């Protein structure tokens, strides 16, 4: 199927590695020019940009001024901007129960995930006011759908993205851009640098127990779902939806068998 992305332009945040890098490569393979956002890994972003004929743009999306400037910079470099993928985020690897969760970590996690996504979305919505159309894809997580013990900060941020933020955005954006769409991709456990060292044999058995497909996702699995939602042809009448890429996951296995 032709996704209608040839000749379009997209911005992918958090694209210097992992899922973001796979998203950028997938969109480029469909013919889009891609602005590859990075916060600190400039070398990886520039290498990827060279590989896919894209552009690398650095910004700290927790900083309002830098986030506001990112979309105009992408438009300046690409000449247009049809899609924006708000992928940047951080999963804190250390398990900390809520009763012991420091306020500093709570704030840090929400800033890196929810605030960064809000600022990216706000900047893109300001852009589509002048174009009347576009696709915004927010990357959330199954942690935001089912909760995640030991990572309540991350789960809360991703739940806010997938529900309150996305649903408000899809209703607001059409007031100024009649053909703009907002959707969410919610990956489950995915093989990526962020989960490196976490997916032990024991963990794999535990996390796949509620998945009919009994496997974790690849970054490319997530990227293809994003490309579908970014498509003006395949998903041109799709807005306000959450596409879960988690092998049919139905929830959490809270207790070990037996």
What do these predicted ranges mean?
Residues 9, 16-17:
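Conserved glycine-rich cofactor-binding loop
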Residues 94-98, 102-110, 207:
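Substrate-binding pocket helix/loop in short-chain dehydrogenase/reductase
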Residues 95, 234, 239-258:
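Short C-terminal tail/terminal secondary-structure segment
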Residues 121, 157-158:
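Active-site helix of classical SDR
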Residues 121-122, 167:
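A short, exposed helix-loop element centered on a Lys and neighboring polar residues
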Residues 141:
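Residue(s) in the substrate-gating loop at a strand-loop-helix junction
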Residues 176-181, 237-239:
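Short, small/polar-rich loop/turn modules that mediate ligand/substrate recognition or access, typified
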């Amino acid at each position: 199927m032709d996704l209608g992305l040839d000749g379009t332009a997209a911005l992918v945040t958090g694209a210097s590695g992992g899922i973001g890098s796979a998203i950028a490569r997938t969109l480029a393979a469909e013919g889009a020019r891609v602005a590859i956002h990075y916060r600190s890994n400039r070398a990886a972003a520039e290498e990827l940009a060279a590989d896919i004929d894209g552009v690398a743009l650095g910004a700290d999306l927790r900083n309002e001024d830098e986030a506001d400037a990112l979309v105009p910079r992408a438009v300046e470099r690409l000449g247009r901007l049809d899609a924006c993928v708000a992928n940047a985020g951080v999963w804190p690897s250390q398990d900390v129960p809520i009763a012991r969760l420091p306020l500093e970590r709570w704030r840090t996690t929400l800033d890196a995930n929810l605030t960064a996504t809000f600022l990216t979305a706000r900047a893109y919505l300001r852009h589509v006011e002048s174009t009347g159309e576009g696709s915004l894809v927010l990357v959330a997580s199954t942690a935001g759908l089912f909760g995640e013990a030991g990572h309540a900060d991350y789960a809360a941020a991703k739940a806010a993205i997938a529900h309150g933020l996305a649903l408000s955005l899809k209703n607001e954006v059409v007031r100024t851009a009649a053909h703009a769409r907002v959707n969410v991709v919610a990956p489950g456990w995915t093989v990526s640098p962020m989960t490196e060292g976490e997916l032990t044999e024991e963990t794999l058995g535990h996390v796949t127990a509620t998945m009919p497909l009994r496997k974790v996702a690849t970054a490319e699995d997530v990227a293809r779902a994003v490309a579908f939602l970014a498509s003006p042809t395949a998903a041109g009448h799709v807005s306000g939806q959450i596409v879960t890429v988690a092998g049919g996951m139905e929830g959490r296995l809270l207790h070990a068998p037996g």
